[in-house]
């Protein structure tokens, strides 16, 4: 490996660059808006709910079933406490980053930033937990079904709340 790279940092930089490319390709594949965080909520208001649903499932499958991202996720999980850079990457890719992303999406639907954050936690928390459940499960199909049910139920509750507000 070191014949092709000058050291660990160059290897990590290449891995992160590949992950960024994969993220961009998936966002484009699912036609998700590419905007700055302040524009997320407005951009997502025009995206069909089924598209957000499909993208969320694709994200989960990306982090669990695709070999490169799944190994990257597991590596970050193990190394997050040993190396500050790995901890930062873990937070950006798997913890705080996705929660902030979802909170930005929910800001226009919520009465406050705090409520948007609660929606984001309610949406992403089970998905985050299911990464670990999936890794250890002998019946991974059931885990995917649980995630599917969670996302559909969350969307139904969000839509019902939106109708009540009108």
Where would I find each of the regions flagged by the language model?
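Hydrophobic/aromatic-rich alpha-helical bundle segments in the mid-to-C-terminal region
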Residues: 88-92, 96, 105-154, 165
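Alpha-helical structural segments
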Residues: 3, 10-54, 58, 89, ...
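Feature detects amphipathic, helix-rich regulatory segments
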Residues: 2, 8, 13-17, 61, ...
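Short amphipathic alpha-helical interaction/hinge segments
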Residues: 23-27, 67, 84, 127-138, ...
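Amphipathic alpha-helical segments that line or abut small-molecule/effector binding pockets
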Residues: 42-65, 70, 74-78, 117, ...
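Amphipathic alpha-helical packing segments from all-alpha helical-bundle domains
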Residues: 50, 64-110
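Alpha-helix C-capping/helix-to-loop hinge sites
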Residues: 58-63, 83, 109, 130, ...
């Amino acid at each position: 490996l070191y014949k092709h790279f000058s050291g660990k940092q160059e290897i990590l930089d290449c891995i992160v660059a590949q992950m960024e490319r994969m993220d961009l390709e998936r966002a484009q594949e699912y036609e998700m808006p590419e905007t700055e965080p302040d524009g997320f909520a407005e951009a997502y208001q025009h995206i069909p709910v089924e598209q957000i649903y499909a993208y969320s499932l694709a994200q989960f499958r990306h982090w669990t079933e695709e070999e490169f991202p799944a190994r990257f996720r597991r590596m970050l999980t193990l190394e997050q406490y040993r190396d500050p850079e790995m901890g930062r990457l873990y937070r950006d890719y798997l913890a705080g980053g996705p929660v902030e992303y979802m909170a930005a999406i929910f800001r226009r639907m919520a009465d406050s930033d705090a409520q948007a954050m609660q929606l984001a936690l309610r949406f992403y928390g089970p998905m985050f937990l299911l990464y670990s459940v999936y890794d250890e499960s002998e019946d991974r199909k059931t885990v995917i079904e649980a995630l599917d049910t969670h996302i559909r139920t969350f969307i139904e509750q969000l839509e019902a709340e939106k109708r009540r507000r009108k």
